[in-house]
Amino acid sequence: RELLGPENYAFFLGNDVVIVLDNIIYGENKRYKEGYADHVLAFVKGLERLLPESSDLYIAQHSPLRRRRQDFTNEKILNANDLLSIVHGHKTMFISGHSHVFHNHEYSNDVIDQNIAAICGAWWDTERCTDGTPRGYKVYTKNNGKLEWYFKPVDHDKDYQMELFM
């Protein structure tokens, strides 16, 4: 914190607001839970009171709102419903990583959760993530109120689609 600054912060981008949250709750022996600690919820609640109703929110965080379990079912992370109730009324885009796979979940017309495949591939071991996505990142633009995005692989141009090996 002394070197990098706070782990929870926000800034305006035009009328919209980017909120950066720490949603990893560390326990003992390197164990952690994915979710929102009480102080994180309090931060967002205090911030939301200051925002114009017309502001769209972009919440950048490590873990997505939904966690994929080993049996391939999904469950929301700890206190996700509390956070969703705080930001209710704003168009909200959650942008996360953590899983090294691409996954989009649309909760409603106003809430989208985008989990982006990692720029490091599968933990720096390969050029691909575990779902086959090449390592890369997303680029977001907003023009005339319309949000658009595309994925940009690290070693290819933005129009790159796939490679087939036979």
Pin down the residues of each PLM region.
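Extended active-site neighborhood of metal-dependent phosphoesterases/phosphodiesterases
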Residues: 1-55, 72-95, 104-142
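Proline-rich low-complexity regions
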Residues: 3-5, 64, 164-166
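Short, well-ordered beta-to-alpha junction loops that form the rim of enzyme active sites
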Residues: 23, 60-64, 98-99, 152-153
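Flexible, glycine-rich phosphate/dinucleotide-binding loops
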Residues: 27, 66-67, 122, 146, ...
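Active-site segments of SGNH/GDSL-like serine hydrolases
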Residues: 55-71
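Short, well-ordered alpha-helical microsegments
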Residues: 66, 102-103
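A short, hydrophobic/aromatic-rich structural module that often spans a beta strand
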Residues: 67-76, 113, 160-165
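A short C-terminal boundary segment appended to hydrolase-like catalytic domains
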Residues: 138-166
